[in-house]
Amino acid sequence: MLAADPASTRPRRAEVLAALSLALDLGLGQPMEHMLRAAVIATRMADRIGMDATERGVVYYAELVSWIGCQADSPELSALFADEIAFRAGTFPIDLRGRNRARFLLGQAGHGRPPLAGGRARLRLLADGRRRMHELLESHYASAGALADRLGLGAGVRDAIHHTFERWDGTGLPRGIGGPAIPIAMRIVHVADVIEVQLRAAGPEAAVQLARRRSGTQFDPQVVAVLTGAADEIFAGLDQQDVWPLALSQAPDPRLALSDPEVDALLIAIGDFVDVKSPRRQGHSRRVGALAARAGQSRGLPETTVHALRRAGWVHDLGRLGVPGALWDRSGPLSSADRERIRLYPYFTQRILGRVGGLAEVAEIAGAHRERLDGSGFPRGVDGSSLSVPARLLAAAARLQSLTEERLDRPAVGLAQAVRTLEREAAAGALDAQAVAAVADAAGQPQPRRRARATGLTAREEQVLALAAVGRSSRQIAAELTISEKTARNHLEHIYTKTGVSNRAGASLFAVQHGIVRAGPPTG
């Protein structure tokens, strides 16, 4: 993949969303540029169908973000299938209907688990798997719609991606919608998304054969006819090493440059989207960005550098989308392969962001947040001679913020204890002592009070929402607030009604957007 054009100083909307699609590819277990290649296939089919510019634009962006809800349902999906990324990757080669679907789901339930645990997972799936899959996909759609709105993609894209898992034959999930009731944009995306994988794996002839086999079952026969009637033209150029410029040329707004506030809004939304993958990380990226920026200001960095540092904090964890959630939550030892997957995530963060014109500095800072002065960090293991002041500040800010947040294997620690930990790491040569001092000072600064509630929630409901957003069950919420479990459930029902969300992920995004999730480290 080529670097972004250094002459481009204002990110373009299509570039930012194309970069997001690269991160989504990682979460699907596909190589980066899968969705970009599929978008080329989809828009070329749209052209041959005769769709107008608006409809064609819906096809393009629906293809790029059709899986945008997949991170929101990652905790629930990994509870069912252990490795949610392997599960998603496994859906492409199989026509998921009837016995094929049952065999696939049962096989995935045991995938990567010891025999006894795998057997129990299969039994749970047999007992109530259909209900849980329906709930999971409804959650996916709700979260995908909310995120699409925040990305400014419009009602057409939102409607299309609400049909991502439906099928032409009406056997899809969760609603069993079929035939022309599925928006034409999504019927095109259904074909393009699967066919790109087959094209890359086995070539044009195999891709055409697969489309014909699934015509009338998963795929709209008329869309398949368009593909098979002009396959050579539709597939042209997709075998080139770098498809980025070709895919961007198909965008409905390839030259639409964004203002600074528009870029900020997109990057904040992307950071929130990354955090929703883990209930314990809600609001993490926003807090890291704010903390790093305050530390940069205290160090006297130029405002342009502080702005880049803040942005890097918002999106520093983008590459985490390529790591199964179970690896982050595993308390036991990791295999060497699993450790390598984790060590590579900052590399993918930098590689993805580096494609966007105007974000080169952001990409460099974000990609170095796990590096250490003594060379003990990752992904590159560079030492202090290669680490800029902003990179050192972000490393300290991300480390402190993580320590003050609860994780599966440990409770959150207070600010004073977290600072002492960072000071020890600085004394050992891992973190920069000046960066640690600046971050500690910034973390101790009084933060602006959140403005008065404009959410329609009561004070108690906000307390309940703050706990639900970080993964607490109704029973845990009841225990922490000293209320009954029934009262906690009632509060959650009222919260969902008032906020217009229907699931944990939606509630988490709402809480982060409205400042209800804790905004900074605990001071104890």
What are these regions (language model features)?
Residues 4-454:
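Metal-dependent catalytic cores of enzymes that make or break cyclic nucleotides
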Residues 471-506:
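Recognition helix of helix-turn-helix DNA-binding domains
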Residues 496-524:
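Basic, Lys/Arg-enriched C-terminal extension of HTH/homeodomain DNA-binding domains
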